[in-house]
Amino acid sequence: MVLIRVLANLLILQLSYAQKASELIIGGDECNINEHRFLVALYTSRSRRFHCSGTLINQEWVLTAANCDRKNIRIKLGMHSKNVTNEDEQTRVPKEKFFCLSSKTYTKWDKDIMLIRLKRPVNDSPHIAPISLPSSPPSVGSVCRIMGWGTISPTKVSYPDVPHCANINLLDYEVCRAAHGGLPATSRTLCAGILEGGKDSCQGDSGGPLICNGQFQGILSWGVHPCGQRLKPGVYTKVSDYTEWIRSIIAGNTDVTCPP
């Protein structure tokens, strides 16, 4: 009973904060074409359907979620509209893919991360540029930016032509524990959303970035369906917990293991 009261009070406090912060929300609309130069789209050569997003972290490497892995992945960089091609759009295929513990094993709360080495590097251009790994973990209460080409309807699949962006709040992990049964006491994930609902990542946005105070802090891992439900924030892989693993692989130490 004590735990229930504590979590209830925490939810009330977080909801109060979210209601104030929601007045600042820009999202739910088309992203500015200049704000997502690091955002990439993943699709398969067979279906040609975009199923995930990812983040360019340097000219040769993309970070996304392990649940986005498919055979014959193609990676589209520099894209805004699916139907109107930018002059500097480029397509790449993976040269190598790295998972934690050299496997594809992950859970809803751990190790949902995939590092992709591109077969050919890309150059910076008007619509392509990497974003750095975070210098420090994010703080609860931060306003964070989500983006992607995922469905814009919470109940049916309705993929937009252009990426949509929204601002959500970084919440205490205990909020996600209260909202989603089965989460452990600790995990290498972030909890983010708008507790009164209406703003959320959704189907097709997996693997995309969570940008908090200008830093790349999270990778969309999972959420509930229908999307955008009240008191049901999303779960994001915590990038700052994996920076050492990422940097080691990029430096050539491919035998490095993920944090426990």
From Swiss-Prot:
SUPFAM superfamilies: Trypsin-like serine proteases
GO cellular component: extracellular region; secretory granule
Main subcellular location of this protein, as a coarse class: secreted
Proregion residues excised on maturation: 19-24
Residues bearing attached sugar chains per UniProt: N83
Classification via Gene3D superfamilies: Trypsin-like serine proteases (2.40.10.10)
Subcellular locations according to the entry: Secreted
InterPro entries tied to this protein: Peptidase_S1_PA, Peptidase_S1_PA_chymotrypsin, Peptidase_S1A, Trypsin_dom, TRYPSIN_SER
Intrachain disulfide bonds: C31-C165, C52-C68, C100-C258, C144-C212, C176-C191, C202-C227
Family: Belongs to the peptidase S1 family. Snake venom subfamily.
Biological role stated in the UniProt entry: Snake venom serine protease homolog that may act in the hemostasis system of the prey.
Protein name: Snake venom serine protease homolog
